[in-house]
């Protein structure tokens, strides 16, 4: 056995050499002539985490919209109170091509099982949809250390579109997001702890902020029983920003069960929370090229 291969006890293994993948972004033509969609990305675990999130929310079916510039995943949680919209911009991946705008329907449980078998040995995922096999979506995973390629063929359908779900995309348009009066950031741990603790005492919590440089205030009060107040006094520590005029008060009541289930499902370390005047909440996080938005409707209370 050569000296390069033999290792003494306790000595760490040789450092893995990771290929340098160029991110070319959007292509004018596909690499494979039969492709209607081609998506190549050097971070397969992002998809694994996304489908773990869908699993945690007990989502069933997932709509996939492919456009010439991006791919977007739409789904609902089990309670139907939250809507998930996850987008990957084609310019941020190794290469991306979609011939036109089209929709695919995939079963979450089927795809989830596939991603369960994917670990860090796989450094690239390629997704292909072909003109000659419209009922099939190809997932190709590559392990460059041993030059292994694993290909899954998943049956897809032309879905019945959930227009209420798709309409939720307007809530996260660039123009709409500018007008949200209150936003801040929590770690996933803080979000989970806050709403888990609150759930022991009450079903509703009030989120409140006065205009100007004032703390974020979460509280509940039960008549002749118990009250609780949670104040965030340093806006910079939670990246708190607001457009609330000094003479006004922003206040909404939120159903804790909806937020608690989301907090338990989160797969990112940091979450940006945006509040709309009608009480709707947006939970926004990022994983490399993926932008993950979850919209929770206050009128579902």
From Swiss-Prot:
Induction: Expressed in the late phase of the viral replicative cycle.
A GO biological-process term: symbiont-mediated suppression of host cytoplasmic pattern recognition receptor signaling pathway via inhibition of IRF3 activity
Sorted UniProt keywords: Host-virus interaction, Inhibition of host innate immune response by virus, Inhibition of host IRF3 by virus, Inhibition of host RLR pathway by virus, Late protein, Viral immunoevasion
Top-level taxon in the UniProt lineage: Viruses
InterPro entries: DNA_clamp_sf
Job of this protein: Plays a role in the inhibition of host innate immune system by acting as a negatively regulator of type I interferon production. Mechanistically, interacts with and prevents host IRF3 nuclear localization to inhibit its transcriptional activity.
Subunit note: Interacts with host IRF3.
Family: Belongs to the asfivirus E301R family.
This protein's name: Uncharacterized protein E301R
Organism from which the protein derives: African swine fever virus (isolate Pig/Kenya/KEN-50/1950) (ASFV)
